[in-house]
Amino acid sequence: MFIDRLDHLVLTVSDIEKTCNFYENILGMKVITFGKDNERKALTFGNQKINLHKKGAEFEPKALLPTAGSADLCFITITPLHEVITELFQKNITIEEGPCERTGALSKPILSVYIRDPDYNLIEISNYK
């Protein structure tokens, strides 16, 4: 077997509306509605998708122990990190750590800042150096 790429991931959240607002207005993602009866929400950016499940009302099948606030996600941006920091400051978003150097998925250095989403998931925003 050869896995080519990640198609989507599921994020369990306590409040779909708050989550959509944060990822759309703070991180610039697009909110989409989908499903047979348009009952589902997802966040899209580039060729990526994050499906949202409300804690306690998850769609089946689901993770064995779906938990809001347990994710640690790294997003790569082409926006220079100093501009990201300025924008986060203007939007009253607390930077928990950074800027600091880490190693990205390409085994190359990235420069990162860390913030929290409404469920306290750890969100890393990075530029490849």
UniProtKB/Swiss-Prot annotation:
CDD domains hit by this protein: GLOD5 (cd07253)
Similarity field: Belongs to the glyoxalase I family.
Domain annotation VOC: ranges: 5-128
Ranges in a coiled coil: none
Name the UniProt record assigns to this protein: Glyoxalase domain-containing protein 5 homolog
